[in-house]
């Protein structure tokens, strides 16, 4: 039931083209990976943002709003991010089943981007959307890849899974039409090698990334308490709540880059709910993370001094 392709984003764009028609709505849950917007808008479809509710500690789904948006006859596709990027949520079985039931009720197909599925916190369970129940299996297309986990993005390799024979055929046709259905021979062999022989390395990586996250959390608590890291159980990314400092993550990210040379992503690009947040990648050596946190500290200090002067 797997269809090989050159990347998750090309597959998402193909799904939007094949499973919807122009001017229809595609629902996403923001803040979410910014390329989702491109895959939707570049193909002449409308973005519907189901903003996740944030209580200062964690994110949850606004179920009432979600049902209203799915009930709109113009909404025909939902792109689910599982695990969620940038917040790091791993949606539990009950949540996924509820999403599946609502989408089935309102005839909405689910495309589940599960590219971060192998990058979970050690000891934490990840649940594929299609595995939850028959409903989730029959109404969904799942996108997976080794590219985040094993740093193989440059090889352009991914796969699409669809148990439903009709969805499987439609995706196969569109991926071939778009000429993104055949990864190169080297990518195929690298993918096989990664999954066959990379388990021990991956376990060590997950432990290492988790320690980096713990370091960042402790550093912020001690040195920059105005920034609050959102607790996430997946991805090698950290989602930082900077709203006690600024409401514009975009401007803050630019300032940090200018003053310290540290590259972080402003939260505004991830849609509603991303304002005042930063996304930080900690999939690197401890020394680089330590240096990055020191640069962040210096930039925050400079920002606060400028704010004080301007007032």
Q: At which residue positions do the language-model features occur?
A:
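N-terminal small-domain helix-loop-helix segment of the aminotransferase-like
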Residues: 1-7, 14, 65, 194-197, ...
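Phosphate-binding glycine-rich loop
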Residues: 1-25, 246
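Conserved PLP-anchoring active-site segment centered on the Schiff-base-forming lysine
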Residues: 18-40
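Active-site phosphate-binding strand-loop segment of PLP-dependent enzymes
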Residues: 54-124
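PLP-dependent enzyme catalytic core of the Aspartate aminotransferase-like
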Residues: 67-68, 136, 255-264, 270-311
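Conserved core segment of the aminotransferase class I/II
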Residues: 133-210, 219-222, 300-301, 307
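Conserved glycine-rich beta-strand-loop-beta hairpin in the small C-terminal domain of fold type I
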Residues: 185, 192, 208-217, 229-242
């Amino acid at each position: 039931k797997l269809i090989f392709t050159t990347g998750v984003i090309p597959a998402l764009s193909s799904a939007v083209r094949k499973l919807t028609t122009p001017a229809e709505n595609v629902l996403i849950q923001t803040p979410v990976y910014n390329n989702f917007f491109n895959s939707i808008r570049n193909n002449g479809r409308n973005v519907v943002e189901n903003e996740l509710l944030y209580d200062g500690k964690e994110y949850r789904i606004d179920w009432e709003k979600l049902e209203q948006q799915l009930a709109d006859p113009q909404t025909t596709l939902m792109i689910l991010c599982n695990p969620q990027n940038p917040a790091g949520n791993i949606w539990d079985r009950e949540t996924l089943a509820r999403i599946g039931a609502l989408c089935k009720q309102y005839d909405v197909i689910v495309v589940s981007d599960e590219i971060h599925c192998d990058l979970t916190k050690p000891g934490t369970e990840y649940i594929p959307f299609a595995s939850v129940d028959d409903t989730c299996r029959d109404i969904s297309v799942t996108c997976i890849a080794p590219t985040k986990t094993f740093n193989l993005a440059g090889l352009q390799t991914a796969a699409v899974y669809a148990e439903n024979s009709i969805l499987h055929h439609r995706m196969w046709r569109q991926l071939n039409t778009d000429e993104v259905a055949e990864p190169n021979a080297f990518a195929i062999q690298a993918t096989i090698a990664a999954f066959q022989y990379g388990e021990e390395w991956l376990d060590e990586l997950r432990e290492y990334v988790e320690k980096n996250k713990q370091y960042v959390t402790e550093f912020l608590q001690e040195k920059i308490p105005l920034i609050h890291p959102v607790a996430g159980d997946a991805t090698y990314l950290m989602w930082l709540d900077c709203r006690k400092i600024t409401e514009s993550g975009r401007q803050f990210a630019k300032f940090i880059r200018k003053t310290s040379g540290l590259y972080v992503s402003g939260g505004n690009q991830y849609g509603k709910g991303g304002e005042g947040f930063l996304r930080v990648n900690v999939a690197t050596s401890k020394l680089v993370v330590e240096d990055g946190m020191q640069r962040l500290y210096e930039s925050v200090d400079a920002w606060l001094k400028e704010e004080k002067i301007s007032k």
